[in-house]
C-alpha cells in the first residue's frame, strides 16, 4: 500500500513542478485563516460575559465596542486570506491541468499505432477531454476546500478542548456517528465514479463510431438496432451517474443532521454545566458558534472527498493512458541518408499485430530506384500491412527493410516519413484553407508550384470556381466529392516531392473520368520515383514495372503484367475475373 501511494505521488510530481511555493503560501494562508476563524468566538465569549456581567451592574460599552472593532478587522483579514488561498489553488490547478493536457498531446505522438488498434477513438478522446476536465473541475472545487476545512477542524478541536473538555467531548462524540456513516458511503462511491467515467467513454466511443458510419447504418436499416445498443450504454451511464450523484446528494443532508444534533447536545450539556457554576454563559455561546464551525468543515470535507474521489477516478484513467508503452526513443539516432536514390529491399520480413497471430510470414522483395511496384491480392492478404511496415508505423518482428542499403531500424521514424509521399484511400482534410491543406507542414512552396501540382491532378479548375479560390476555407459550408478530396490529397503528396511514393487504393472510389485523369497525372509524376501502388482494380497497374501478388501474408507470384498473365496463375485468374466483371457492368 505504501509503495502504491508513493507511485501515485510520483505520477503527480512532474505536473506540480514549480507550483510548490505558491501551494505552500496557499496552505499557510489557509492555516492563518483557520486560526482567525477559531479565535473569533473567544472574543465573542468575552463580549457575552461583559454583557451578562453588566446586566447586574453596568455594561462596559467601551470594552464591547473595542472587542467588536477588533473582530471586524480580524474577519476582514480572514476574508483576504481565504480569497488568497482560493485564488492560488485555482490558478495552480489550472496550470496542473494545462500541463496534463500537454503531456497527453505529446503522449499521443509517442504511442505506437497498436494502441489505437486496441482502443476506440471515443475512449481516447474521453481520456483527453472529459477525464482531464473532470479532474480539473473536481480538484478546483474541492482541493482547497478540503485542506482549509481540515486545518479549521484541527484548530477548532484544539480550541474547544482548551476551553472546556466536557463540551468538546460531547461535540466530538456526537459527530462520530456521522463520520461512520460518511465513511461507509465514501467507500462505495469510488467505484461508482470510476464506472461513470468508463461508461461515459463507452457512450462517446459508440456515438463517434455510429456517426462516422451513419450512411452504412441507415442503408442496412440498422437504426433500430443502433438505438437499442445506445439505449443500453446510455442506461449504464445513467445508472452510474445516478448512483454517484445520489451519494453526493446525501452527503450534505447527513452532515447537516449531525451538525444540528451536536448543536442540541452542546446546549443541553452546557446548560447543565452552567447551572452547576462550572462554566460561564460566554463559554456556552462560544461553543454554540464552535459547533457550527465544527460541523461546517466536516460537511465540506465529506463533500470535498466525494469530489476528490471523482477526480481520482478520472486521474486514474489519465495516468493509465500516460503509462502506456511508447515507441522506441530515437533521439540518439542520426540521419542516415542524404542523397536518396529510392531502392527498397524487403528481406524475410515477418510481422503480426499481436504476438499470437502472424500476418506477414516471410516477405522478400526488391524495388529498384524509379520503379513502379504494385502490390495486389485479395482482402486480408497483407497489402496495407506491408505499407504500414514500410512507413515504419509498426516495428517488424523479424527480417529487415532497407532503403538504399540502410536498415530502417537504424533510421528515425521522421526520416523514413520524410522519404515518402503518401496518398491513402481514406482522405484526410482539416478545417483550413485549401492552400493550407495542400502545403501541409511544408515550407518554401511557392504559389506557382502549388498551382502546377493542382493542375497536374486536374483539381485547379474546380478550386478556381470557389469564391476564394485557394484561400477557400474547407468547413461544413464547402461540399467536396470523394474524388475531389482524393485529388487534393494527391496534390498534397506531389508537393511534398519525396523520392518514394505510396498510393493505397488511391483511385478505387472515384468515377472513371477522374480515375483516368489521376492515372495520367500519376504516371507522369511517378517518373524517377520509386512508387508502391495498392489497388483492387488491376487495370490501373498494368504498366507497373513489378507486381507483387500476395496471399495470406506471402508473395506467391511476382513479375510484370505480361509475365504474370503468361504464367496463368493466381494473378491471371484475378485479372480475368475483374475484366469479366467490368464487361458485365458495362
Regions found by a protein language model. Name each.
Residues 17, 113-114, 132-139, 143, ...:
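An intracellular "coupling" helix at the cytosolic face of ABC transporter transmembrane type-1 domains
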Residues 53-55, 60, 159-173, 243, ...:
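Helix-loop-helix
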Residues 1-37, 52-67, 85-89, 93, ...:
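Membrane-integrated ABC transporters
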Residues 89, 93, 109-153:
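Juxtamembrane loop-to-helix connectors within ABC transporter transmembrane domains
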Residues 23-81, 161-166, 277-281:
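Transmembrane helix-loop-helix hairpins at lipid-water interfaces of multipass membrane proteins
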